[in-house]
């Protein structure tokens, strides 16, 4: 994911 984005920013996981």
Swiss-Prot record:
GO cellular component: extracellular region
Modification after translation: Ocp-2 has L-Phe instead of D-Phe.
Residue runs in coiled coils: none
D-phenylalanine: modified positions: 2
Main location: secreted
Keyword match Protein biosynthesis: no
Identification of the protein by name: Cardioactive peptide Ocp-1/Ocp-2
Native source organism of the sequence: Callistoctopus minor
């Amino acid at each position: 994911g984005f920013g996981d």
